[in-house]
């Protein structure tokens, strides 16, 4: 306790000392009093999205954007929204000086941004400061007498072990000279290092004696030996590379931040909060407030108010600083920085003290030494008070933890969700103990049911989403999901303006043998859907029943099932099902219909990406279709345990959709928006084969080898070359070279606008062609519908499709 308190105290005192020592910022005398100019550099890579923001002052009356002295206007790549400008798919033509001119009543502010878009990816450039030195040494060596190779900078090669996190760029250098000029080659683990040994290859810069590997993964671990040789001799040097895989954890907040702050009335207070998180964090700033004269509710948890929360256009750097302008005495109090990700929640608090404006009489001015002493003592007093308060609070409430309900403007602070169930008391005890409180915690990967007979639990009520149970009429079951079952239902009065309107909905609920982990996952999915918000092309949360009974999560109902079965049910007669060859679909799909499906899914994924949500299981089976043929992405809020699943065994915890997974996700478990783009490419292939199974006839073990060798699925018969190129772009080996969902939306929107409604599909050709032919080792039972490498058994409703090879029927 003493050690932790000392660290906090030193953090506060150091921050105070720095603030005292910092000189005031003033403009040079030669700058006109009515104009202020700031210059900010901005670097980007080709294909990036450039976002420039103008920091607004309170007295700003108008904003103008200028590039190289010319007024900027919106184009198909440039979007201007007041204080912000966005340029998509950046290129060298976007280089220049951008000026944001804001006019106020007393002065004009001009912010200059010098934008530089490089001509090549940074990984292809070598910016080593020793390049020129190496070149000059080589020239000097060429003019000298013949000699064997020698290291030119051995002191820079002393560090042999390099431990770097995954996805970083690694560069090894072996600078040498000799006459004649030596040659350079590299070994990995004492064997020749070939380009095809790693996804994306590597680069050798002979002129700088360097080896460059972009986006390293755990499989890149090993010993790398450079051999420099000429006809007079050879030398070598070995580096050891250790790639540290990033383990998921809740956000880590820098110790001592935010720090206690003291300001005078009318000035600006600033709190900083440095957040470290591998999964994308969601950051909020909260202020502790009083309700009915009390800062603490009856259950012992304090009340808080949300001051600042992350939005679509806010960066993490913006969220790490809280500015309180023109502070008053009412602003004094406790402030909290809250950071949450998919793993958990962390928070730090600090106090704001508001002081009176000091009299300007010289006799009353404190010396710098006195001011430092006052700040140190004040900081020590507040830290001591805070530590004592925490100790007393924990002694009185040993079993309670803290968490934040981030969706309420004023709400209680709680760390985990209390779940109440009946408890049997044995013996003759007369205690009134008829219920116990169970805290929902993450279980081990076994997921053993812990709440058998769960009948009642208690969650904080959210008025924005709460639906009365008597307004919900449950109907027939629709199926079983990850957490329990899904049933059809009718909800009355979901639309507040139409209290008697009946809406058909789907309701997710727990099974009778639900575990604590199941409950935690269902609550996490519900909270994720609240946080992400609503969009036309995702399954939206409509409400929830959290009080006086089991948890019901109410979502939109989709009458036409998932996209995979939707497409298969609309195959033309030329692709008849083996069990019903006379079946004729009610509706034939045109080329434009299929492009529309892809366009809608891309729009939904673009929205999820803007909310910093990574799906990790995008496939046609997870896209649902409404009565009006609207595509809606489902299961984006599921908590998936992807780090403890054996790739070669079916487990009770889950199944990996390997046929839809990007190589970096499959081999190194790196999940990003770019890995979702790979899955979207497979979904495109599913759409244009009307629900075909990816990589048909390819065994899972062979699939891994094919992906590493760069093989990709062939173009579907009724797919245009442009759309097939889009698929192949999504399947690029380098994640950074894949298109973004925003770019995919723009391209599909253009293709959709040029499509004709009359282009009905001729699917007399096979849909399951794939260039590497493999014998079908399975029985004649149809099994083309496998969702993952674990499933080799046919689905009960799977249609048996004819097997083709090179345009002809393939013998079984």
UniProtKB/Swiss-Prot annotation:
Q: Where does ATP bind?
A: 478-484, 508, 556-558, 562, 621, 635
Q: Where in the cell is it found?
A: Cell membrane; Nucleus; Cytoplasm, Cytosol; Cytoplasmic vesicle
Coiled coil regions in record: none
Q: Which stretches are transmembrane?
A: 372-393
Picking any one GO molecular function of the record gives: ATP binding
**Entries under Gene3D superfamilies matching the protein:** Immunoglobulins, Phosphorylase Kinase, domain 1, Transferase(Phosphotransferase) domain 1
Q: Which residues lie on this side of the membrane: Extracellular?
A: 21-371
**Keywords in UniProt for this one?**
ATP-binding, Cell membrane, Cytoplasm, Cytoplasmic vesicle, Disulfide bond, Glycoprotein, Immunoglobulin domain, Kinase, Membrane, Nucleotide-binding, Nucleus, Phosphoprotein, Receptor, Repeat, Signal, Transferase, Transmembrane, Transmembrane helix, Tyrosine-protein kinase, Ubl conjugation
Give positions of region: Disordered. 121-153, 784-812
Q: Which SUPFAM superfamilies match?
A: Immunoglobulin, Protein kinase-like (PK-like)
Where do the Ig-like C2-type domain residues begin and end?
A: 25-118, 154-242, 251-353
**Does this UniProt record's set of keywords contain Nucleus?**
yes
Mainly resides where? membrane
Glycosylation positions? Answer: 76, 116, 133, 223, 236, 260, 292, 313, 326
Q: Which residues form the Protein kinase domain?
A: 472-761
Catalyses which reaction(s): L-tyrosyl-[protein] + ATP = O-phospho-L-tyrosyl-[protein] + ADP + H(+)
UniProt subunit comment: Monomer. Homodimer after ligand binding. Interacts with il17rd.
Q: Which purpose does this protein serve, as stated in its record? A: Tyrosine-protein kinase that acts as a cell-surface receptor for fibroblast growth factors and plays an essential role in the regulation of embryonic development, cell proliferation, differentiation and migration. Required for normal mesoderm patterning and normal skeletogenesis. Phosphorylates PLCG1, FRS2, GAB1 and SHB. Ligand binding leads to the activation of several signaling cascades. Activation of PLCG1 leads to the production of the cellular signaling molecules diacylglycerol and inositol-1,4,5-trisphosphate.
Record remark: domains: The second and third Ig-like domains directly interact with fibroblast growth factors (FGF) and heparan sulfate proteoglycans. Isoforms lacking the first Ig-like domain have higher affinity for fibroblast growth factors (FGF) and heparan sulfate proteoglycans than isoforms with all three Ig-like domains.
Name the record gives this protein:
Fibroblast growth factor receptor 1
Taxonomy of the source species: Eukaryota, Metazoa, Chordata, Craniata, Vertebrata
């Amino acid at each position: 306790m003493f050690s932790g308190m000392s660290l906090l105290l030193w953090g506060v005192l150091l921050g105070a000392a720095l603030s005292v020592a910092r000189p005031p910022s003033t403009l040079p005398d030669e700058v006109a009093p009515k104009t202020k100019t700031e210059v900010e550099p901005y670097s980007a890579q080709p294909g990036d999205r450039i976002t420039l923001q103008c920091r607004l002052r309170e007295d700003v009356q108008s904003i103008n954007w200028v590039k190289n002295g010319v007024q900027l206007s919106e184009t198909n790549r440039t979007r201007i929204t007041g204080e912000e400008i966005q340029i998509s798919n950046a290129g060298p033509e976007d280089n220049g000086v951008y000026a944001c001119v804001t006019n106020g009543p007393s002065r004009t502010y001009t912010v200059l941004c010098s934008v530089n878009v490089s001509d090549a990816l940074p990984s292809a450039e070598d910016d080593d400061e020793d390049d020129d030195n190496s070149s000059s040494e080589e020239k000097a060596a060429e003019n000298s007498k013949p000699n064997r190779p020698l290291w030119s900078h051995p002191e820079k090669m002393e560090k042999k072990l390099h431990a770097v996190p995954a996805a970083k760029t690694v560069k090894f250098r072996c600078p040498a000279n000799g006459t004649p000029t030596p040659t350079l080659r590299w070994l990995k683990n004492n064997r020749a290092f070939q380009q095809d040994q790693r996804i994306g290859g590597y680069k050798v810069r002979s002129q700088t004696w360097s080896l460059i590997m972009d986006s390293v993964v755990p499989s890149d671990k090993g010993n790398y030996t450079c051999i420099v040789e000429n006809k007079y001799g050879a030398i070598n040097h070995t580096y050891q590379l250790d790639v540290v895989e990033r383990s998921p954890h809740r956000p880590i907040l820098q110790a001592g931040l935010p720090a206690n702050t003291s300001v005078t009335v009318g000035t600006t207070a600033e709190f900083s909060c440095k957040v470290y998180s591998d999964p994308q964090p969601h950051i909020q700033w909260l202020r502790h407030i009083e309700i009915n004269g009390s800062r603490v509710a009856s259950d012992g948890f304090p009340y808080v108010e949300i001051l600042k929360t992350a939005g679509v256009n806010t960066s993490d750097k913006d969220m790490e600083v809280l500015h309180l302008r023109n502070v008053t005495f009412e602003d004094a109090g406790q402030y909290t920085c809250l950071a949450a990700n998919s793993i958990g929640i962390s928070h730090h608090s600090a106090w704001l003290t508001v002081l009176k404006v000091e009299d300007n009489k010289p006799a009353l001015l404190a010396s710098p030494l006195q001011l430092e002493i006052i700040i140190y003592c004040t900081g020590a007093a507040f830290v001591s008070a805070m530590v004592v308060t925490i100790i007393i609070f924990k002694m009185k409430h040993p079993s309670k933890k803290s968490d934040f309900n981030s969706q309420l403007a004023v709400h209680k602070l709680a760390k985990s969700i209390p779940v109440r169930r009946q408890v049997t008391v044995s013996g003759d005890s007369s205690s009134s103990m008829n219920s116990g409180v169970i805290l929902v915690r993450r279980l081990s990967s076994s997921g053993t049911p812990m709440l058998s007979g769960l009948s009642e639990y208690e969650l904080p009520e959210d008025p924005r989403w709460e639906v009365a149970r008597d307004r919900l009429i449950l109907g027939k079951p629709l199926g079983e999901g990850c957490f329990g079952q899904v049933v059809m239902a009718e909800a009355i009065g979901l639309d507040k303006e139409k209290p008697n309107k009946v809406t058909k909905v789907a309701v997710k609920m727990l099974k009778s043998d639900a575990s604590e982990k199941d409950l935690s996952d269902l609550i996490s999915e519900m909270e994720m859907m609240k946080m992400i918000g609503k969009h036309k092309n995702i399954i939206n949360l409509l409400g929830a029943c959290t009080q006086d009974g089991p948890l019901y999560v109410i979502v939109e109902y989709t009458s036409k099932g998932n996209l995979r079965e939707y497409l298969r049910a609309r195959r033309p007669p030329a692709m008849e099902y083996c069990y019903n060859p006379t079946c004729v679909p009610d509706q034939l799909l045109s080329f434009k219909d299929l492009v529309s499906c892809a366009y809608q899914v891309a729009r939904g994924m673009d929205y999820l990406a803007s909310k910093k949500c990574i799906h990790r299981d995008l496939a046609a089976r997870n896209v649902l279709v409404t009565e009006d043929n609207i595509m809606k992405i489902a299961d984006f809020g599921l908590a998936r345990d992807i780090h403890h699943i054996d790739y070669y065994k079916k487990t009770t915890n889950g199944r990996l959709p390997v046929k839809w997974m990007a190589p970096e996700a499959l081999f190194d478990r790196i999940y990003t928006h770019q890995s979702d783009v790979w899955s979207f490419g497979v979904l495109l292939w599913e759409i244009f084969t009307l629900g075909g199974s990816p990589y048909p006839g390819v065994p899972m073990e062979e699939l891994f080898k094919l992906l590493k060798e760069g093989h990709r699925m062939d173009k579907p018969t009724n797919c245009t070359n442009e759309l097939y190129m889009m698929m192949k772009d999504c399947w690029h080996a380098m994640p950074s070279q894949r298109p973004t969902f925003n770019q995919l939306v723009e391209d599909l929107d253009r293709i959709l606008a040029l499509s004709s409604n009359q282009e009905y599909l001729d699917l007399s050709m096979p849909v399951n062609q794939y260039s590497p032919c493999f014998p079908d080792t399975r029985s004649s039972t149809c099994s083309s519908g496998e969702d993952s490498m674990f499933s080799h058994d046919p689905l009960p409703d799977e249609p048996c499709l004819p097997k083709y090879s090179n345009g002809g029927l393939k013998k079984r």
